[in-house]
């Protein structure tokens, strides 16, 4: 007999319109969870909303707001659309570290800005290549343009208009967070995501608030046309996200208005993607299946 206890079942939360929440193994739609790269759709929406308010233009060059960056043709739109040419991760980040983003502070990002032209793998606008680094740069530019912290500008331009300002946050309220647990029931340590990487993947939210974000942005279009931070596959708009021990998938159909929010604590992020895509493409053609990014 193995001395190890069996693996814990994966907590799951699925929210869909007109259906009772599917909540398994201790998940809770009212508690705060890590949302990973779903943060990006909120950052992209903030860019579009700030442009509509006249605070900036989506085609502003990066150096307009971050003067330390060289004039290399990268615009805020390129950063939002993953066409900037910047690498997936900031230089020196990743590898075998259990907390890869801890060294990526605001000061570290500032030190990288003068090298953006040399860090880009190709000229902006030429190829699409998913970039967490690019969204960190975008977040810094938004902060400079707004003259306020990322959490504050996001609250003003996106969260309050959607009615979810109290349930999407930079840090979870004390006693209201939900985290993955190991075989022996101990809470598992997550990544440090409150530095420069915050606009790329560091937010916390309740699943019920994320459901309101999905329906509000993609179905009701309460803030106008969805930002191109969302990914598109035929008639699907979607995005996913993952941290060390959490994963999420959110999406909606542009033809029927159906939407889904899936969040899991532990397990493989790919399984979260498959479940979310399957729920959105029930009785639909195979061509409509969302092709999730491997990077989050």
Whereabouts are the PLM-identified features?
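Short beta-strand segments enriched in hydrophobic/aromatic residues
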Residues: 142, 217, 254, 262-266
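A short, well-structured edge-of-sheet supersecondary motif
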Residues: 1-35, 58, 95-98, 249-254, ...
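Active-site SXXK
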Residues: 34-58, 138-143, 210
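Short, glycine/proline-biased beta-turn/loop segments that scaffold the active-site neighborhood
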Residues: 57-72
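Short, surface-exposed beta-strand/loop "edge" segments at domain boundaries and coil↔beta transitions
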Residues: 245-246, 260, 267-273
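Structural preference for long, well-ordered alpha-helical segments in enzyme cores
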Residues: 46-47, 154-157, 275
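Short, gly/Ser/Thr-rich active-site loops of penicillin-recognizing serine hydrolases
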Residues: 268-296
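Short, surface-exposed loop or secondary-structure junction motifs
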Residues: 8-11, 16-17, 72-249
């Amino acid at each position: 007999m193995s001395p190890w206890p069996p693996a814990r079942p994966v907590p799951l939360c699925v929210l869909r319109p007109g259906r009772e929440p599917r909540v398994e193994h201790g998940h809770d739609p009212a508690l705060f969870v890590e949302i990973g790269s779903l943060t990006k759709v909120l950052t992209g929406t903030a860019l579009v909303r700030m442009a509509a308010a006249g605070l900036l233009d989506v085609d502003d060059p990066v150096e307009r707001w971050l003067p330390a960056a060289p004039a290399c043709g990268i615009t805020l739109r390129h950063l939002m659309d993953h066409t900037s040419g910047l690498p997936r991760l900031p230089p020196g980040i990743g590898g075998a570290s259990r907390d890869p983003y801890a060294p990526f502070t605001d000061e570290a990002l500032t030190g990288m800005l003068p090298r953006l032209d040399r860090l880009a793998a190709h000229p902006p606008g030429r190829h699409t290549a998913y970039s967490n680094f690019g969204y960190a740069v975008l977040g810094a530019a938004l902060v400079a343009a707004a003259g306020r912290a990322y959490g504050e500008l996001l609250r003003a331009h996106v969260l309050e208009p959607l009615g979810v300002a109290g349930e999407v946050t930079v840090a979870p309220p004390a006693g209201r967070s939900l985290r993955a647990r190991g075989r022996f029931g101990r809470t598992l340590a997550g990544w440090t995501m409150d530095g420069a990487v915050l606009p790329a993947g560091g937010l916390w939210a309740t699943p019920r608030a994320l459901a309101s974000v999905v329906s509000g942005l993609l179905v009701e279009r309460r803030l106008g046309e969805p930002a191109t931070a969302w990914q598109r596959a035929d008639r699907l708009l979607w995005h996913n996200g993952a941290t060390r021990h959490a994963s999420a998938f959110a999406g909606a159909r542009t033809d029927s208005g159906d939407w889904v929010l899936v969040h899991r604590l532990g397990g493989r992020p790919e399984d979260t993607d498959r479940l979310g895509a399957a729920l959105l493409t029930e009785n639909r053609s195979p061509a409509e299946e969302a092709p999730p990014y491997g990077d989050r």
